[in-house]
């Protein structure tokens, strides 16, 4: 019989119970005991759901109260030096992730090319030790519910160290962890663990080539020291970087991604690289929400089965990246809904595929195929769109000329101050929006409320003496979902939440058909805000690449076509804003770097397509219209040429948590356009000191001209509280004025 498994399950819960529990603890509304009890209740519920889905191996250790990499850091005593004197408890754990009054938070980076963020481990000569065997505790807890189906899951030592910062000697760092992993594994085996899943996704990246010898040594050590353990060497998000070497590791099974790494991994299977090994085949897309093509997938599984000692079917990666279930999405078009598969439905899919492979007939298998075919044939996927050959893809003049024209119009001071776009969304805002959605208040009442918030924050910004203002985005729940509600080809869900970082959950829209601009999206609120002040107010849009990367995108057409469709829609909205007198328009490409393929050989094509779509969106404006863009946490050195090629008049970049790493990208490369490198971290409630912000302004000015530098927070301020937001912006403005004075002298 073919087995079925999973790599990980969503933490949030069907109604975001996980998020609400953690935030209640942060707010002091529940005790530590309540937090731990609530977390256990959720864990056990998730285990039972997977047991009832018919899984043969159920992941344990994927659950976290913030981030699974942070869990390892605290477990292995890789605690940042600035927190070293604090007791090792849950409050320290959250402080490392979020910061506190005394110390800044650790860096946060994207988990490979997903929209999930992990807390970067900081090495600073700590002595690794096992503070607790958390995985053993969770395994013993799980055995009470699922018995011997419990499968411990842990990120492997090579990936963990590769994702760290401050590592002076990679080999020494890995070696220092091996006795700790050995103890964890030994205790798990003694407790009855059959399989142990060790995640090593670094080996699907180009960087993984540098660690092949380390992999040989590490897994030889585990095989010798824990001989009774059955290890699954698990990778995802791409194909193995070197299957010839890695397939020879002394492990029992290999978990491979046959969705995003299909070409390389299938070739390795066909050539017999994994002959005699168990294969855990990731054939269900764990990162997107479309139902699987059972016809193609069943044929693929037959090929894999022929070349493996034993086959287990599973999703391509952890289901952390998709919502929990479609069962509550009753408002969706039936053709669309029947073509979707969230986490629970994906578990059903792996079970049905296994039963079909074993020769068991099931009418549900054939019904699944019928639903899949109906979606592919739907009319909304075959719309005639604007001819791209008639669309401008280059600004009329170069940046130097545009800058002079824009400055003559805007009269901005040296080091202009601004924010990224959103302001705090209070409980009152959320409550009023919900009342409007339920029909408890009228459209007119809701509009009046939103306008009152806009006016209040315009006055706050004027009082703070910011130079370029924003309307605050109070009408938006999410920067991508908002546009998904307004464009043809998109739909939104009621409960389609996924974790982005910590307790931050997002509800990505679904791009199910061809995309078109239907009506003004942002014009009314932006024009109203501009009518209240003589200072420029930015129009706030989300760019085509970010909309795509932060949505559940359709996969039946090439990505560049989808980029271009959305670029055309954003172009139409930009033109409406420009015609309405808005002089500065920000087109956020927060997720440009996030979508970058993990392999360098695939990156140029993606970046070329991304730049082209941005040009489609922004190149039809006049020289006097200033185009801004914004980007989130990224390794920018590898995409600096693409950033320059966007030809945005000003780019703002999230930098403060990088502790200087991102700034170095712009210190070593000539960047001629306007730029704002975030001067304080908005992901932490901590208010920066003026001295910190002054330093964060002055450091990039060693390389960048003051005439091109803008001063702004790291990112939007929607998730912050109003008092801390105003306090931090006061510091930002005061620091900017101090630096201006120094420059003037």
UniProtKB/Swiss-Prot annotation:
Q: Which residues form the active site?
A: 683
Which Pfam families does the annotation name? Meth_synt_1, Meth_synt_2
Locate the residues binding L-methionine: 420-422, 473, 588
Residues recorded as binding L-homocysteine, renumbered to this chain, are: 420-422, 473, 588
Q: Which Gene3D superfamilies is this protein grouped with?
A: 3.20.20.210
**Is Glycosyltransferase there in the keyword field?**
no
For the protein in the UniProt heading, the enzyme class is transferase
Activity sensitivity to pH: Optimum pH is between 6-8. Outside of this pH range, the enzyme activity decreases rapidly. At pH 4.6, the enzyme is only 7% as active as it is at pH 7.5.
Q: Where does Zn(2+) bind?
A: 630, 632, 654, 715
Q: What's its EC? A: 2.1.1.14
Keywords assigned by UniProt, alphabetized: Amino-acid biosynthesis, Metal-binding, Methionine biosynthesis, Methyltransferase, Repeat, Transferase, Zinc
Going by the entry's taxonomy, the superkingdom of the source organism is recorded as Bacteria
Any one GO molecular function term: zinc ion binding
Q: How does the cofactor bind to this protein, according to its record?
A: Binds 1 zinc ion per subunit.
**Cofactor(s) demanded:** Zn(2+)
Q: Where does 5-methyltetrahydropteroyltri-L-glutamate bind?
A: 19, 115, 478, 501, 504-505, 550
Q: Name one GO biological process term.
A: methylation
Quote the pathway field.
Answer: Amino-acid biosynthesis; L-methionine biosynthesis via de novo pathway; L-methionine from L-homocysteine (MetE route): step 1/1
Q: What CDD domains does the record point to?
A: CIMS_C_terminal_like (cd03311), CIMS_N_terminal_like (cd03312)
Kindly give the InterPro entries that the UniProt entry links to this protein. Cbl-indep_Met_Synth_N, Cobalamin-indep_Met_synthase, Met_Synth_C/arc, UROD/MetE-like_sf
Q: Please state which protein family the record places this protein in.
A: Belongs to the vitamin-B12 independent methionine synthase family.
Q: What is this protein called?
A: 5-methyltetrahydropteroyltriglutamate--homocysteine methyltransferase
Species whose genome carries this gene: Streptococcus mutans serotype c (strain ATCC 700610 / UA159)
